[in-house]
């Protein structure tokens, strides 16, 4: 199992970080504003960001358009969103999470985690794909930081 994990400190309280993140999941335009490789997003079952709800997302990863469905597994207010890919991607990507840790009144650490099931052959042949995935996750965090720390 490979774990992709990236953390970034953001000068904003957890509720502001989570609020910004929640807005990204509300419309295609907001989702696209988060990262240039994001294409589309919509809720296809349940209420937005409620446990058990299903979201459909399109984004470019390693140069290829991926059409993905995720189930929201766990929500901890102002702290965590855990979600899992649905079949067939669940065979390769069994878990993902966004975690926000408070670092005082006006600071948080945002951590994005994605798990990948991969054997030795993929690790050897899929090095570029793994590097692109790491870059994408890192850029998402940097874009949150930039949006929340930039003067309005």
Where is each model-derived feature located?
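Hydrophobic ligand-binding cavity/cleft-lining segments
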Residues: 1-45
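Beta-strand/loop substructures that line and gate deep hydrophobic ligand-binding cavities in soluble
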Residues: 84-135, 139, 146
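Short, surface-exposed coil-to-beta transition loops
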Residues: 3-5, 65-69, 92-97
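Short strand-connecting beta-turns/loops that link adjacent beta-strands
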Residues: 13, 77-78, 103-107
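Well-ordered beta-strand positions
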Residues: 9, 73-74, 101-102
